[in-house]
Amino acid sequence: MSKRIALFPALLLALLVIVATALTWMNFSQALPRSQWAQAAWSPDIDVIEQMIFHYSLLPRLAISLLVGAGLGLVGVLFQQVLRNPLAEPTTLGVATGAQLGITVTTLWAIPGAMASQFAAQAGACVVGLIVFGVAWGKRLSPVTLILAGLVVSLYCGAINQLLVIFHHDQLQSMFLWSTGTLTQTDWGGVERLWPQLLGGVMLTLLLLRPLTLMGLDDGVARNLGLALSLARLAALSLAIVISALLVNAVGIIGFIGLFAPLLAKMLGARRLLPRLMLASLIGALILWLSDQIILWLTRVWMEVSTGSVTALIGAPLLLWLLPRLRSISAPDMKVNDRVAAERQHVLAFALAGGVLLLMAVVVALSFGRDAHGWTWASGALLEDLMPWRWPRIMAALFAGVMLAVAGCIIQRLTGNPMASPEVLGISSGAAFGVVLMLFLVPGNAFGWLLPAGSLGAAVTLLIIMIAAGRGGFSPHRMLLAGMALSTAFTMLLMMLQASGDPRMAQVLTWISGSTYNATDAQVWRTGIVMVILLAITPLCRRWLTILPLGGDTARAVGMALTPTRIALLLLAACLTATATMTIGPLSFVGLMAPHIARMMGFRRTMPHIVISALVGGLLLVFADWCGRMVLFPFQIPAGLLSTFIGAPYFIYLLRKQSR
């Protein structure tokens, strides 16, 4: 059986090599007659423009694709090995978003010189790394704390970047293409800088081979074998962060390879660390090589697209196809080294207090605000005039926050993975892509089609996840990997459409950022009715949600039918997410963070966890919507972005408090 499992991806890999080689041959032949290849490679004739392009653009581009792909495969294995999480990749600790934020700032301030942008990218990545290490240091750099801190800091940097894009859309137009990766070269300078740096990274990785191998074991076992765990994690993650920042400097952000290459290496039978490092690097180089040659061909026959988009569009279907053949994979226990507050008693009192606090927040959001004359508390006739404008927005934020928080709670309990959230399942991205696609297909004002288009996108995404994960018995991690594959592909497609410069994308940019701007009374009533129905179903699932975090074997032992249970919970979470996304757009924070905040406050039993998560999610988004309307009055900041600014520091504080 294992030979059959290994044979299939091996044949697939061989097919990809053949296709990449054929495409390279065809692209090179179109650019220059084969009889001139040797001369153009070694000493191009400066009077023949085709030879100059071949020597200074095509060949360096091929070399950089192989180098960057290999580097992404290498750091993907490093992150997955150190964090012991199959979903970890170079963007997990926020390295890519930190580097992107640095580049955005230099672009916005028009700081000249290539070295300035490279330094900014390195500085952004290193600052993010230091923040993440600082938060997790007190817990001996435990994998779960590192993952959560990295995700939150990554979301925070991404929110700042998106905010700058909203207010400086035209100035940062060039950033969209870079954000999805571009391998365009004009000389050999990039290759000459990158290959010695990567070689140094490989040598340091080999020096860390034994500690890295031990880090794949349980923490207690690794310590008993004499490993200084915190120091080893710090060294390995620092190395991975530096290599990732170098790759971002070279070509921008190219996602998915760091996730996909290590998984395919495992499928090919590379169980030991050294073969896995080598094989993942080869697979990464192959995928990026193939993607770039497809781009060169598309540029000639259609239009230029970004490298990261094609990489995701190649990798996502491949991963979905290979998922049923993926052996069982595991994630770190969410409770390892966990020193959360003691389980809270008197849950009803806390829930009532939270409900009162939420009601007060709604009243303040309705009545207190700014106008042309300053701060005012609206009442009487003025409040009646403001109600049609403020009421739908506040209710939309409240309902969406509650639904995303409950969906996040269900998904994290269903999968037992601390990285799980509605956004990771790809349903939000699928809904957003459906809306954007409809915007391009329907002439005139397409916003009337927002709900059906988004619902269809979410439904198709869910269907693909269920088909891909269903053949593997609905393993939680297969669901997450399928969701991540689709989410990455949809996100890259959205960024590619943004980079196209089409004016229609500016219309939907605010909605994508999580704005309540277009909320209407009718939409809020529909959302409220659906929310009440879905929340009424949730308590019926409490036994499942209590038992599933204990593991599949325990669930079977008490007579639970695992596959139908997982399908039902996945459907419930998907409906909650899709409804919230249709109301205010795809958010990137509440569904991930609200369940963790509730758990760290001491609510770990199923129903208290769900109730407090819902209250936290609703409060967070109501407050975020009010701040978004008032902070830069008369300008507005989308609630989805501002919820990150409000929630992330508090979440980091809770993580830090745990580690003391």
Swiss-Prot record:
Changing T182A: Loss of binding to ferrichrome-FhuD. Gene3D superfamilies: ABC transporter involved in vitamin B12 uptake, BtuC. Changing D170A: Loss of binding to ferrichrome-FhuD. SUPFAM superfamilies: ABC transporter involved in vitamin B12 uptake, BtuC. Keywords: Cell inner membrane, Cell membrane, Ion transport, Iron, Iron transport, Membrane, Transmembrane, Transmembrane helix, Transport. Changing M175L: No effect on ATPase activity, but 50% decrease in Fe-ferrichrome transport efficiency of the FhuCB complex compared to wild-type. GO terms for molecular function: siderophore uptake transmembrane transporter activity; transmembrane transporter activity. Changing M492A: No effect on ATPase activity, but 80% decrease in Fe-ferrichrome transport efficiency of the FhuCB complex compared to wild-type. It is found in: Cell inner membrane. Induction: Induced 2.1-fold by hydroxyurea. GO terms for cellular component: ATP-binding cassette (ABC) transporter complex; ATP-binding cassette (ABC) transporter complex, substrate-binding subunit-containing; plasma membrane. NCBIfam families: PRK10577.1-1, PRK10577.1-2, PRK10577.1-5. The complex is composed of two ATP-binding proteins (FhuC), a transmembrane protein (FhuB) and a solute-binding protein (FhuD). FhuB interacts with FhuC. FhuB interacts with FhuD. FhuB binds substrate-loaded FhuD more strongly than FhuD alone. FhuD interacts with a periplasmic and a transmembrane/cytoplasmic region of FhuB. The transmembrane region may be part of a pore through which a portion of FhuD inserts into the cytoplasmic membrane during transport. This is Iron(3+)-hydroxamate import system permease protein FhuB. It comes from Escherichia coli (strain K12). The lineage of its organism: Bacteria, Pseudomonadati, Pseudomonadota, Gammaproteobacteria, Enterobacterales.
